[in-house]
Amino acid sequence: MYKFYKHKLYKKYQDELWGHIISKKSFSYNKKSILLNYRDIILRNRLRIKTKFKYFRRGFLKNLNYTLLLFKFFRKNIRVFSFKRRQSLSVPLSLSSKRFKTKRKVFFKTSKIASLLKFNIFYANTVAFNKVFIKHNYCLSSCSNIYTQTKLLYFPIISVNRGLVFYKSKNFLRVNNLQFVIKKKLNLRKQKIFFYSVHIAAPKKKTKKWSLFALKNIYYKKVSLFFGFRKVVDFFKVYNLAGALAKGNSFAVFLMLEGRLENFLMRLNLFPSIYFIKKFIEYGNVFVNNKIINYTSYHLNFNEIVSFNKKYYKKLYFFIKSKLRQRKVIINAPSFVEVDYKLLVAMLIRNPDELALTKPLSFNLYTKFLSVNR
């Protein structure tokens, strides 16, 4: 961590910020010698947080300052509560009066910091109630509201309710933005960033050797995800079924997969993902020859008209336009599919050729369909 702040990038960032302060109109060059001390001590501490955690989510420094303030004021309250428990605190009587009660509620709701004033008012109420209860028992009814208020909003004692002291600050102690605090408190080891580097003397030491088994696993996983199977086992069921019907012709497996309704809709560039299409079909929003089809494994025949629910026409048009603007249309409509984007109607014309077939891998007999495209 100390080495990081000696880095050129940190020094460059520090000089830029310092130059920004000097360039202000309110800055006078006579103060330069005084502000050098400010640059070395205070500014370095602020930059230390900003440079290291500037890639964290929005509002990190705000939440950090908020939690530190909460801790500071809670610590003051604990100190007062423990050492000045039996003494009456110097709080104006007007703050604990009934007239100020309504204003006080609004003030405490809007205030972001659990201030020392809030605790002192409640403490003054308890002291006043104890005096009244001992001397004048007939005043119990008039002070009953104060008693209930102090019991409900009683400041937590450390020995009894240790967890409630930092109740409000728990909302801001999150793992993402205050991870360095937790690591410091628990004395955890720092996570070292691993940079892959090649050994200069013997480069073969760092090279990864791919076995045939590893290539097969990559192949099966890539194909199963491409065609919408979350598990490789589900892909093998279709693969074995098509292999039995086509008598071992592996090309027929992919012809069978392209004929499935979910894969057919994916080639039209109308939907964001194949998993979205699965839910879209299951809810009965796809029609084949004006009949609702609610299962994804439906095999299309030639010249069957596929249409959609009219409720989602605007959303589909909007999705097409957004994809065209972002230039994210990866594949045009294939040659074996005919699509009308105005009417939102499509049909399967013929079986795909080997060139027209959409596939995530290269068909090569030498590697037995195991060479992955990169």
UniProtKB/Swiss-Prot annotation:
S4 RNA-binding domain segment(s): 259-323
One Gene Ontology MF term: rRNA binding
SUPFAM superfamilies tied to this protein: Alpha-L RNA-binding motif (SSF55174)
Cellular localisation: Mitochondrion
UniProt xrefs under InterPro entries: Ribosomal_uS4_CS (IPR018079), S4_RNA-bd (IPR002942), S4_RNA-bd_sf (IPR036986)
Keyword entries, A-Z: Mitochondrion, Ribonucleoprotein, Ribosomal protein, RNA-binding, rRNA-binding
A GO cellular-component term linked to this record: ribonucleoprotein complex
Main location: mitochondrion
Pfam families, per database record: S4 (PF01479)
Family the entry assigns: Belongs to the universal ribosomal protein uS4 family.
Protein's name in the database: Small ribosomal subunit protein uS4m
Organism whose genome encodes this protein: Acanthamoeba castellanii (Amoeba)
Lineage of producing organism: Eukaryota, Amoebozoa, Discosea, Longamoebia, Centramoebida
